[in-house]
Swiss-Prot record:
It comes from Xylella fastidiosa (strain 9a5c). Its EC number is 2.5.1.16. Homodimer or homotetramer. The active site is at 160 (proton acceptor). Keywords: Cytoplasm, Polyamine biosynthesis, Spermidine biosynthesis, Transferase. This is Polyamine aminopropyltransferase. Spermidine binds at residues 66, 90, 160-163. Pathway: Amine and polyamine biosynthesis; spermidine biosynthesis; spermidine from putrescine: step 1/1.
Length: 285
């Protein structure tokens, strides 16, 4: 990461690329026990949240990520009631999950309370569901939370984490996935952000391999645009305990959903289930 008087620039060694945003200044900064969190104001992308030099979200395009990590999984499950979010400290995913009126309980566990406090201060539009009576916000280790989570108690687990480094490294291995597998009901789903399908397919393959070793039987990776992330293209990966899962979704419910979205709809969901040939070939679909 580099900054000067007018630009925030993030360099991506893994992809040999960089991305920049014209800024008007730094609005806030806090050093938590886990990471440094910075907020910048930009000329065209609203506010930026940066953690340890890596851009996490912008006001302008965060809806893409938050909608795609939430709604496909929730409309794929037949009747989700209980959801766990690991990570998700900016609370945008929590907001999207709680748009579903039949959800009864959501527990969000993020290791760093300061991410949520900074989001409440600078991205209040993401935090409109923080006081929903169905929501419980915990600030502790997500790996430990899943280790202690009761068996067969959760319908959907959403792993809304940073990249697999630092505090999030433990969310990308077999041990963590075994805890998720045990906590999910038989028809439960795990969905996790899975990086860029254009540049990091090997990481997605490794994630699926670790999930498979933990017991998951079927997988589907859904790509979507994300301009502020490396390559401008991102993905989430759904995992099922059922060997014959085809990830068909409740299309009528998605078409008649009683809430607004900016990116997700039933037609898009249907299309994203068909991967581009290079992804299908690499992932054996």
């Amino acid at each position: 990461m580099t900054t000067n008087d007018s630009w925030f620039t993030e360099h991506f060694q893994a992809t040999g690329s960089a991305i920049g945003f014209r800024i008007t200044g730094k609005l806030d900064e806090v050093q938590s026990p886990f990471q440094k969190i910075e907020i910048y104001n930009s000329t065209d992308w609203g506010k930026l949240m940066v953690i340890d030099g890596a851009l996490m979200l912008t006001s302008r395009d965060n809806f893409l990520y938050h909608e795609m990590i939430s709604h496909p999984a929730l409309f794929t499950h037949t009747a989700p009631k209980c959801v766990v979010i690991i990570g998700g400290g900016d609370c945008g995913t929590l907001r999207e999950v709680l748009k579903h009126p039949d959800i009864e309980q959501v527990t969000q566990c993020d290791i760093d309370e300061q991410v949520t406090r900074m989001a409440e201060k600078h991205f209040p539009e993401l935090c409109t569901s923080n006081n929903d009576p169905r929501a419980t916000l915990l600030f502790s280790d997500g790996v430990a939370y899943m280790t202690d989570c009761p068996t067969n108690s959760v319908d959907v687990i959403i792993v809304d984490s940073t990249d697999p480094v630092g505090p999030a490294k433990g969310l990308f291995n077999r041990t963590f996935y075994e805890s998720c597998f045990r906590a999910l009901k038989n028809d439960g789903l795990l969905v996790q952000q899975s990086e860029s399908p254009l540049a990091l397919l090997e990481l997605i393959k490794e994630m699926r391999h670790e999930m498979s070793k933990a017991g998951f039987k079927a997988f589907k990776t859904l790509p979507f645009p994300q301009p502020c992330y490396p390559t401008g293209w991102w993905s989430v990966t759904l995992s099922s305990k059922q060997p014959n899962a085809n990830f068909a979704f409740r299309q009528t419910d998605a078409q008649t959903k009683p809430f607004d979205t900016l990116y997700y709809n039933a037609h898009l969901h249907h299309g994203v289930l068909v991967p581009p040939p290079f992804i299908a070939h690499a992932l054996g679909e």
